[in-house]
């Protein structure tokens, strides 16, 4: 029964000290940027009813959810996604729209073993609800680019795709559901040979404009030249409108001076089926995992109430932290500047002194040791160079200079302070 008590479950890990601080800083900087741009915060429970994720289109595989029972025998899951719970809130609370919201929290998804993916990750994101025009997508992309800039993330790119274009092709060629799943993997992985064989085996007419577009889809990535090529092969107004939307977003972001951060990939297809239009994925050259994902989902909120258009982007905090650790100097944990050693009957004065020194910009901690020599040893081990002893009616300040020497007695060198 104790076989696994010293181990973590597959796909999880512990975060210690400096890394915890860095995760917290990334979350807070993202949150601050989003709030400054007018987003309002929403929090949803870590656990949700299974039914929240089990509507008809099944956007998340059942096998990827962590499931258990509540006290009444109902199936509960650890949330595998942040957007669907937010859709539940918007659909059931009848919030006034348009609405810009931001969130941050852990999501849990059971990935296959040995994939290198974590089953618990931190996501911070934004959603714009109630707006179906291109301004919503533009606002989302600007918000994320600016947040990544403030985090000093280097060499990132946000790719813009269009799942509606792919859906139009599938519909026009009458490709069945099971075949579509196979086709999707070929396009996403840019497996040109397998895609060509698929077209041959399905006996699709290679002279047909839609088939030509399908075969070229995995190759349609880059800048605006990609759009021009796709427009030539678009065989319906719906396809042309889908392509035009990507073009409008790209041009708007480029005019703002952010063109170096974006690219187009019309062969990108999100694995979550609730997306209905423009989709996004962000990458950093140094790491293989995506750091940003999202898109337009105009039909999702209707599963919980009124049908409302919406678009959103999620930032993968863990991947941002990994990138920052690789791109920048190792994160240095802020050391304690001063440690206060105190007699137990002087606790109140010691705490008052700690608060005063902290207001002066110092990082100050109370010693946990009753013996002054133990405090000295701990201070040396943790590179703390100043110890203040609060005893009887006075203060004694010690500074390390190859040994502990009295710097001042009666008050500290930082602030004037007398015990009373």
Curated annotation (Swiss-Prot):
Record note on quaternary structure: Heteromultimer composed of HisG and HisZ subunits.
Pathways involved: Amino-acid biosynthesis; L-histidine biosynthesis; L-histidine from 5-phospho-alpha-D-ribose 1-diphosphate: step 1/9
Protein name: ATP phosphoribosyltransferase regulatory subunit
Organismal lineage: Bacteria, Bacillati, Bacillota, Bacilli, Bacillales
UniProt record, GO biological process: histidyl-tRNA aminoacylation; L-histidine biosynthetic process
Gene Ontology terms: cellular component: cytoplasm
Organism name: Bacillus cereus (strain AH187)
Subcellular location: Cytoplasm
Biological function: Required for the first step of histidine biosynthesis. May allow the feedback regulation of ATP phosphoribosyltransferase activity by histidine.
Recorded name of the encoding gene: hisZ
Alphabetical list of InterPro entries matching this protein: aa-tRNA-synth_II, aa-tRNA-synth_II/BPL/LPL, HisRS-like_core, HisRS/HisZ, HisZ
Main location: cytoplasm
Miscellaneous notes: This function is generally fulfilled by the C-terminal part of HisG, which is missing in some bacteria such as this one.
Domain of life: Bacteria
Keywords: Amino-acid biosynthesis, Cytoplasm, Histidine biosynthesis
Pfam family, one: tRNA-synt_His
